[in-house]
């Protein structure tokens, strides 16, 4: 398996309106629909759920995740 670097801004813009999974540096994960991304790469999610160890712990609704807390973002397959 090889690593292919990707420019993050177009990647995130392409995920708008799609379900995403966001993992924070501290281990928490949030799943929801990516509503918007700003120039600092802060993320706004709709219908967000918090996951701890892959288990849903609650519904949060609309949330904003500050860019400096994000470890990675990917399209959610579930």
Swiss-Prot record:
It comes from the Eukaryota. GO terms for biological process: mRNA 5'-splice site recognition; mRNA cis splicing, via spliceosome; mRNA splicing, via spliceosome. GO terms for cellular component: catalytic step 2 spliceosome; cytosol; nucleus; pICln-Sm protein complex; post-mRNA release spliceosomal complex; spliceosomal complex; U1 snRNP; U2 snRNP. InterPro entries: Lsm6/sSmF, LSM_dom_sf, Sm, Sm_dom_euk/arc, Sm_F. Residues 7-78 form the Sm domain. GO terms for molecular function: RNA binding. Disulfide bonds: none annotated. SUPFAM superfamilies: Sm-like ribonucleoproteins (SSF50182). PROSITE patterns: SM (PS52002). It is found in: Nucleus; Cytoplasm. Coiled coil: none annotated. It holds the Pfam family LSM. Keywords: Cytoplasm, mRNA processing, mRNA splicing, Nucleus, Ribonucleoprotein, RNA-binding, Spliceosome. Its main location: nucleus. The keyword Ribonucleoprotein applies. Belongs to the snRNP Sm proteins family. SmF/LSm6 subfamily. Plays a role in pre-mRNA splicing as a core component of the spliceosomal U1, U2, U4 and U5 small nuclear ribonucleoproteins (snRNPs), the building blocks of the spliceosome. PANTHER family: SMALL NUCLEAR RIBONUCLEOPROTEIN F, SMALL NUCLEAR RIBONUCLEOPROTEIN F SNRNP-F. Belongs to the 40S cdc5-associated complex (or cwf complex), a spliceosome sub-complex reminiscent of a late-stage spliceosome composed of the U2, U5 and U6 snRNAs and at least brr2, cdc5, cwf2/prp3, cwf3/syf1, cwf4/syf3, cwf5/ecm2, spp42/cwf6, cwf7/spf27, cwf8, cwf9, cwf10, cwf11, cwf12, prp45/cwf13, cwf14, cwf15, cwf16, cwf17, cwf18, cwf19, cwf20, cwf21, cwf22, cwf23, cwf24, cwf25, cwf26, cyp7/cwf27, cwf28, cwf29/ist3, lea1, msl1, prp5/cwf1, prp10, prp12/sap130, prp17, prp22, sap61, sap62, sap114, sap145, slu7, smb1, smd1, smd3, smf1, smg1 and syf2. This is Small nuclear ribonucleoprotein F. It comes from Schizosaccharomyces pombe (strain 972 / ATCC 24843). The gene is smf1.
